[in-house]
Amino acid sequence: MKFKNPKIKKLYDYLSLKSKKAYRDHLLISNPVLSKQETRGRVFETYLADKTPLPTSFYLIAKKIIVYLVKNLISFVLCIIAALFHLISGQKFHVKDGVDYVLLDTFFKIDHIINEGKFKEAYFPGLPEYLSDKNIDYAYVPKWFGFKNPLRLLRIFKILRKNQVPVLTQFQILTLADYLEIARFIFLYPFSLSRFLRKLESSYEDKVLFGGLWNTFDDVAYESHMRYLFAKRLTTMKFGNIKCISWYENLAADKNFYRGLRTFSRKTEIIGAQLYVRPDTLMNIFPDQSDISFDLVPDKILVNGPGFCYDLDSVKVEVGPALRYKHLFKDAQEESFSGEIILVVLPYWDHLVCEILGIISDIDWPKPVKIKFHPTMNWESYEQIIPKNFTVTIESIQKLLPRAFMVVGSS
């Protein structure tokens, strides 16, 4: 895989080697650091800045383990409550026996659905309508973004049922045995990660990885494993053949989902859709060659244009439709560009949001600054560190871009 920065390439290759060893224990496929994701473990930032990783004390380790158990068990209980609420809601998808299906694996943003009172396709606009026009049976297999409160999910289930959205959720098909397996994962995962940590040695890269893994040790880990169980349970349903079109960011949850689908006895095709403008600095976006042997990579990957293609053994990488960017071409012809604002577009990683807000507050900007938070973020959580002369906007990016003199973001 080619990166413009040779240090990123070196870090990518190092993590590739370590993840290949780690994934022999399937529980570690759920670890986001080993998936090369951006995390608060700050492996990427620490390595590129040549910083010395902070030492890990016994107190920190004990604290991380306790917080891990508390956070994961509370989240697991909320997940079980959500499953009960799903049963109460009556939301259900009926699979036609022996019929081929297209499964749309994409994010469902909870706040957006509740605020709008309906589900609006944001990642594959136009695709559901196309499938319906062609009389192709399809169903969503959603990745929930922003799930914390089961009561909010209950509202979502009712909205989906009322609007007759074809959604097949994990809450419908996971069994008691699956929930017991999740509980087992919660208790065994720390031991798997600890065994891997003990094998790390004294190189600078090992120290950076060691610190990153411990800093994220207390994250909620079981959700990625639940995607594996969900996909595996999907394969027991009476589908004909399955074609899965997946919004593909190569996250730990994606890898687990594909691994589960590969247990299907009939024909399964997985298409990973990278139909977005990707930054070269996000390592997880680029599939790892060594992941293929673990069944963690799609059969085909669609990218946003010829400039985004890359070589990957035994996996086709082709140009797909830029479904989300139609407005850019339309606006370029129909709208004038005023250049009246500085537009700051923030990511969905908390530590980077805080860092960017700190940087931009020290600059004397020549024009009014408007801050656009990621749709999944609650901007009010950052109200105290947003400069008073800056404005937070909820306008769409389509309306903001023609007004921007400069756009500031993270990459």
Question: What are these model-predicted stretches?
Answer:
Residues 1-411:
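Catalytic-core helical/loop segments in enzymes performing group transfer/polymerization on anionic/lipid-linked
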